Amino acid sequence: MAAKDVKFSGDARDRMLRGVDILANAVKVTLGPKGRNVVIEKSFGAPRITKDGVTVAKEIELEDKFENMGAQMLREVASKTNDLAGDGTTTATVLAQAIVREGAKAVAAGMNPMDLKRGIDTAVAAVIKDIEKRAKPVASSAEVAQVGTISANGDAAIGKMIAQAMQKVGNEGVITVEENKSLETEVDIVEGMKFDRGYLSPYFVTNAEKMTAELDDVYVLLHEKKLSGLQAMLPVLEAVVQSGRPLLIIAEDVEGEALATLVVNRLRGGLKVAAVKAPGFGDRRKAMLEDIAILTGGQLISDDLGMKLENVTIKMLGRAKKVVIDKENTTIVNGAGKKADIEARVGQIKAQIEETTSDYDREKLQERLAKLAGGVAVIRVGGATEVEVKEKKDRVEDALNATRAAVQEGIVPGGGVALLRAKKAVGRITNPNSDVQAGINIVLKALEAPMRQIAENAGVEGSIVVGKILEEKSETFGFDAQTEDYVDMVAKGIIDPAKVVRTALQDASSVAGLLVTTEAMVAELPKDAAPAMPAGGGMGGMGGMGF
């Protein structure tokens, strides 16, 4: 086991605080509408330029092991906030730095670290209650756009795009962000259920120009197993022919005689039909087939349910307004399933998402949820260079996460105003223990930090801005760093999701509380470089060999 270096009390806290300051100072320059960019060197390719706090935090690794421990603890704040709320990472970092700094001073003055932490926790609980009380639900698409715009660093086009995507696919729908090959940033919305299986034969194509099979007002037959012969299906096929409607068959596979017969029927015009393989594998395939059955109002023909193909009637088939199938994908639009059944299924999938511990399973369940609940939107981010596209993509992802958070828990005035106004709630708390009270006062002071930083990044004195806002009675009065004016933040559309503000403070105080109560630090001693091998002197005693 390697020897360890141990630091205690003041020395440990000083080294740790240096690490905290290095990381926080690099991250906090990005805060607010006039925040600057940070350039990050990459081991290959062009450097990365970003204004995303967590991206900066993740890149910082310090040489001194004790300083690095402080920096890594602070990095944890940014990562945790990003995981839970998807935005607010810079705010969380600024809050954590403020709490750690004041906490370290208090400990150096001889206060009890555990009592300080109790005070910090008490104050944070009061702030969170205050934020939850002030939060207003998101009422309109315009408010969604405003949240997106603020989080995308004042880019109104991104805010509008996200609002448009959310309006189309609903709050449960999936919105993904991809890089575009062109200069433009655009939204591509897929309504209905889309899955990654195309037609089994090009003979099913109805639109030769686009090479797609388009079926209107279509019946959907869902079968769990392979179809190799159509004998058992003849009664239901005849019923479909008589109805004059097209048919989509979704099964594990359609092969041999069954596929040949369907193709011949399609070419002769007897039955307008298309066949695709079922999406997914194993248990997931069965679950997705059941989703399609509920969406289209049909039944899954499954051996588990004791159903045989020969007993299938036309009433057991699902129905949809339109189905579009290309070489690789199938999209079912406007299934005829009952709304109550779809909602029940959505509730069931949500419960599974809550219970699962696997990130992969959670992602797949969320995809299924989106396909049932609304649809999928893809925001394709364009730009002139790869560096620009990556920087813009960071901002779009932040904005998307912020708008989702706003829909979940509502909105509060932005620009650090919500935290500043929460000082009133903290100011009402008193504790007879002076050390606990000192912990409460640490949070009281830290609540000003985000607003000060936003102002300072805009080139304005932070303490003057904070003082002027606290003098005003209006709860929504704040400082617009973009125009350097004092405005009504909500009326101006400068709003933050309550969830982002709450999560930032919770995560910051949690890690900062641990740093304040640290009394010793242990790190591995650097290993001495091994001595170099002596230079080879050749073989001795070869002089008398006549060479």
Swiss-Prot record:
GO MF annotations in UniProt: ATP binding; ATP-dependent protein folding chaperone; isomerase activity; unfolded protein binding
Keywords for this protein: ATP-binding, Chaperone, Cytoplasm, Isomerase, Nucleotide-binding
GO biological process: protein refolding
InterPro entries documented for this protein: Chaperonin_Cpn60_CS, Cpn60/GroEL, Cpn60/GroEL/TCP-1, GroEL-like_apical_dom_sf, GROEL-like_equatorial_sf, TCP-1-like_intermed_sf
Catalytic activity: ATP + H2O + a folded polypeptide = ADP + phosphate + an unfolded polypeptide
Subcellular location(s) of the protein: Cytoplasm
GO cellular component entries: cytoplasm
Keyword Membrane: no
CDD domains named among the record's database cross-references: GroEL
Binding of ATP, residues: 30-33, 51, 87-91, 415, 496
Enzyme Commission number: 5.6.1.7
PROSITE patterns (UniProt xref): CHAPERONINS_CPN60
Family affiliation: Belongs to the chaperonin (HSP60) family.
Listed PANTHER family: 60 KDA HEAT SHOCK PROTEIN, MITOCHONDRIAL
Subunit: Forms a cylinder of 14 subunits composed of two heptameric rings stacked back-to-back. Interacts with the co-chaperonin GroES.
Described purpose of this protein according to its UniProt entry: Together with its co-chaperonin GroES, plays an essential role in assisting protein folding. The GroEL-GroES system forms a nano-cage that allows encapsulation of the non-native substrate proteins and provides a physical environment optimized to promote and accelerate protein folding.
Protein name: Chaperonin GroEL 3
Gene source species: Bradyrhizobium sp. (strain ORS 278)
Primary gene name: groEL3
